[in-house]
Swiss-Prot record:
UniProt record similarity statement: Belongs to the class I-like SAM-binding methyltransferase superfamily. Protein arginine N-methyltransferase family. PRMT7 subfamily.
Name the UniProt record assigns to this protein: Protein arginine N-methyltransferase 7
UniProt source species: Gallus gallus (Chicken)
Positions of the catalytic residues: E144, E153
Catalytic reaction equation(s): L-arginyl-[protein] + S-adenosyl-L-methionine = N(omega)-methyl-L-arginyl-[protein] + S-adenosyl-L-homocysteine + H(+)
Broad EC category: transferase
Stored InterPro entries: Arg_MeTrfase, MeTrfase_PRMT7, PRMT_dom, SAM-dependent_MTases_sf
Annotated ranges, domain SAM-dependent MTase PRMT-type: 14-344, 359-685
Keyword terms, alphabetized: Chromatin regulator, Cytoplasm, Differentiation, Methyltransferase, Nucleus, Repeat, S-adenosyl-L-methionine, Transcription, Transcription regulation, Transferase
Gene that this polypeptide is encoded by: PRMT7
Amino acid sequence: MKTFCGRANPTTGSLEWVEEDEDYDYHQEIARSRYADMLHDKDRNMKYYQGIRAAVSRVKGRGEKAIVLDIGTGTGLLSMMAASAGADFCYAVEVFKPMANAAVKIVEKNGFGDKIKVINKHSTEVTVGPDGDMQCRANILVTELFDTELIGEGALPTYEHAHKYLVQEGCEAVPHRATVYVQLVESKRMWSWNKLFPVHVEAEDGEKIIVSPSEMENCPGVPSVCDIQLNQMPSSDFTILSDVVTMFSVDFSKPVRSASTCYRAQLDPVKSGKAQIVLSWWDIDMDPSGTINCTMAPYWVKPMSAFQWRDHWMQCVYFLPKEEQVLQGEKVHLTACRDEYSVWYTLQKAREEDESKADARVESPVCRCQAHLLWNRPRFGELNDQNRTRQYIKSLMSVLRTDSVCLCISDGSLLPVLAHYLGAEQVFTLENSAVSCSVMKKFFKANHLEDKIKIVEARPELLTSSHLEEKKISVLVGEPFFTTSLLPWHNLYFWYARTAVTEHLASDVTVLPQSAALHMMIVEFQDLWRIRSPCGTCEGFDVQTMDDMIKNSLNFRESKEAEPHPLWEYPCKSLSNPQEVLLFDFRKTVPQHCLSTEGSVNLLRKGKSHGAVLWMEYHLTADISVSTGLMQISNEKGNCEWNPHCKQAVYFFSSVIESETLADVPTAVTYAIKFDTKTGEIAMDFKLL
């Protein structure tokens, strides 16, 4: 059965009704899941297996039957580990129906159908008793309910319920405990993801400084965790201010409380500096003695020889509400507060008067300035990138005249301020969301520009002459940046907006950027390929059914599409030269016909061709460009440096998805890329030769 779904098209800006198969949602969920990544996590799987064997052995050693409850079973892997370790019976709970169906097949295929019962329910709905889902309470609790923040997927309320209703008192738990660690650092780079720094503009009448509204300066930001591959953050980008300390632990073998609470740790700064960031990660002990340990610690804490790449568990960056000066040897107190699903931090000087406040509840951070709702963290980083801003200043200086009437089309951009300071006679900015309007009003007011720059709250196609005070636009500018964009080419919405406002443009209008180009390069990933690679067997268990399910869902939609990834976090090396494949001329309106290209790229280096990376370059003027992708190939090995503020598009080749073993190493890759100007979508196909 087909169903119609209303979707906003990020490239054309129009609302479209799309016919989708009724199974579309779950296919997309499977295709975009990290199941494969978890199955490839050898360290995790091995430690879980060791912990489960030890738990079953302890229960059997007491002369008891080993009854296992596995919550969030996924493929059934942990239940099969328990059954093969000698458990008498396992209850495997999985709420996602397609996954539960796959688990039933996998369990049967591996010969554990008589030892494992898959229950397709949320664990809080599972019943115990002669007529229940479980005959009796379990004495071994096995789960993998953790995310990068540990508790973000609801581990605490799930454990709390399980201890009350599903497991015996004094049960064994795998993992046995989790411990959260923190470290205080100063980092201009990471702080730039949460605060807007002053922007210096050299204008003809002297230096101007663009400042943030005080409301934004004092705003703690949004409560959502910033999870990144901290192992890709060079040590030169942060200064360690404290040793690593334990913030809190959770013992999963005892009743767990999910109610909000706070923890406090004393830190002795090892260096003076600005405390801005709390870096955090966790580890899990699979057994009570802590000998079987799985850790997320970053490279400067544990030796790289013990490093296991994983994408389903990373490390956390927390922004303190405001930066605090700390002095070496002068103690400070770090407070971690948590609710059921998230954690946040505050820092206090360790003075006596603060002791009485130790138990005071600290409210979860809430963005009141709205800028953190408009701009995500990479966008803050982009706006703070002085080199990038200089390119826009340089290009604006070359096109603006004293009589220029300027219109800016981008979401929450600083370009209108730059255009005004650089001499435009009049500046209009098109903001088509209430949030961006509100933020920009505050911004202009803080810089005494509320009477100098006019905000037009309208969609481009609804722009009227009266909005523009009956003036024609001589300079149309955009970064372009739009909050709805996920893939690099979605910002081509600027082209569609430019087309929609054509009647308001002067005949000799200057458009900046004047054009954009789609670029492409073939790469070998160090690790990212694993998220799309089949597993086959995992710790000796056949999970081919899972591979087939993911492949089927990828074929349903995703495998012929590129997906966004921030490649500064995922190292790769180039196997081909970067190549421009499509050009979009913003000086002209969007054409009626499709834009398409075919060709081939030669592979210059040996390596596994995992996929193609695609990105946009914007030609601001004839000789000034900004890239959203490749910044440079840093050495002869082909290691790449990527724009850290943007996600690049990755198209994985079928050789990754289907785990093909190529008899001959390919020497070239052919491509066919088509941009449908009506839908704004890019279709692509690649073949290895």
